[in-house]
Structure formats: structure tokens, C-alpha cells
């Protein structure tokens, strides 16, 4: 990056380290921040700093929060007998946006991936099993991603949870609304068929 002043090159380099941001997008963002009013850049810097200082993981579910427990775990209107297990905090956000789930969550912070050196001990599985000890939870919904790692994690968890006498279910993976069958991959079609329900 010899074409840029050193501070500009450092800014582009740091922006490019963010997931989903390539060199060209990093350059565009850097130039935007440098050309915008100073207050725009300062507000962004303050927001990042504040989030890093104030946000932590909920001691109950592992979701991102600025209170402990998080607002979901602290909500008395939530069903305590229903627990949805997800891989990442962003999965909680996706399910909450759908406004269909009224139970509690447990965030694993990843999935089992031998290729990446991630085993069960690196995930929040011990914490999950501890939550199930109380006997309050009657059903665990495994909402891991429809990937090899997500399926492996779901199978592993089901093997641990079923002996506890807790019902274990798996979300159905199917076609998104508006999708054409011809463009769907085999795993999606297979899961869509397996998860089919009787029409009423």
C-alpha cells in the first residue's frame, strides 16, 4: 500500500480485516470516513469503543448483552420449558426477528469442526447440560446450521441430551419462500422433504 499515506494505509488494512470486507470495500469505507465530517468518524469510533466496553456474554445463555442476565433470559413471559440451541449470537437475532419462538436460548459459540480443531470442549456444551439439570426444560430445539459441522453438532448434542429424559427436536431446513426447486441443492431438498408437515 505504498500509494497511500501511512495512516490511510493502516485504516484500509484494519477495515479489510473485518469479515466480508475485501480490499476494495475497505478502501471505499476508508475514503468515505476521511471525506465525511469528522463527527461521523468520531461517532463510529465511540460506538465501537462503547460496544467493546459495555457488551459481554450473558452468564445464562451466552448471548451478547449489556445486562446480566440478558433481556431474553430476564423476561418472565418467556417459556422456561423450551430451550433453543444455536451456534452464534447472530442466530438469536435471526430467530427473534421472526417473532415465532417464545422460549429461551443457549448459544454454543460455534460448532464441532475437527478440520478447524474445534471439539465439543471448545463449545458451551457443559453449560448447556448444567442448565438441563434443573428439570425445568422439557424440550430442546437444536437450531444449528444446515452444514456438516452443524449437523455433527446437533447429533452429538442429541446423544447427550436424550438420556436426560428431555425431548430433543431439530428445526426443519427447507426452501426459502420464493425459491425455485431447480436452484435448491440436494441437502435443502432432502431436509425440506424430511421436515414436511401435513397441511391443514
UniProtKB/Swiss-Prot annotation:
Query: Which Gene3D superfamilies does this UniProt record tie to the protein?
Result: 3.30.60.80, 3.40.1360.10, 6.10.250.240, RecR Domain 1
MF annotations from Gene Ontology: DNA binding; zinc ion binding
- The domain of life for this entry's organism is Bacteria
Indicate yes or no for the key word DNA damage.
yes
**Where do the zinc-finger regions (C4-type) map?**
58-73
Q: Member of which family?
A: Belongs to the RecR family.
Q: What is this protein called?
A: Recombination protein RecR
Amino acid at each position: 500500500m505504498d500509494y497511500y499515506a501511512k495512516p490511510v494505509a493502516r485504516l484500509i488494512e484494519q477495515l479489510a480485516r473485518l469479515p466480508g470486507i475485501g480490499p476494495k470495500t475497505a478502501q471505499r469505507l476508508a475514503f468515505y470516513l476521511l471525506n465525511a465530517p469528522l463527527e461521523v468518524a468520531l461517532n463510529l469510533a465511540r460506538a465501537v469503543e462503547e460496544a467493546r466496553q459495555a457488551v459481554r456474554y450473558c452468564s445464562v445463555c451466552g448471548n451478547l448483552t449489556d445486562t446480566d442476565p440478558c433481556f431474553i433470559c430476564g423476561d418472565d413471559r418467556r417459556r422456561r420449558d423450551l430451550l433453543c440451541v444455536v451456534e452464534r449470537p447472530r442466530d438469536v437475532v435471526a430467530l427473534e426477528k421472526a417473532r415465532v419462538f417464545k422460549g429461551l436460548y443457549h448459544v454454543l459459540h460455534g460448532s464441532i469442526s475437527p478440520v478447524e480443531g474445534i471439539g465439543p470442549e471448545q463449545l458451551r456444551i457443559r453449560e448447556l447440560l448444567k442448565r438441563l439439570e434443573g428439570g425445568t426444560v422439557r424440550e430442546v430445539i437444536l437450531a444449528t446450521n444446515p452444514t456438516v459441522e452443524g449437523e455433527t453438532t446437533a447429533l452429538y448434542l442429541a446423544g447427550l441430551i436424550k438420556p436426560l429424559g428431555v425431548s430433543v427436536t431439530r428445526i426443519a431446513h427447507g426452501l426459502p419462500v420464493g425459491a425455485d426447486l431447480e436452484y435448491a441443492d440436494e441437502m435443502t431438498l432432502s431436509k425440506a422433504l424430511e421436515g414436511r408437515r401435513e397441511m391443514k
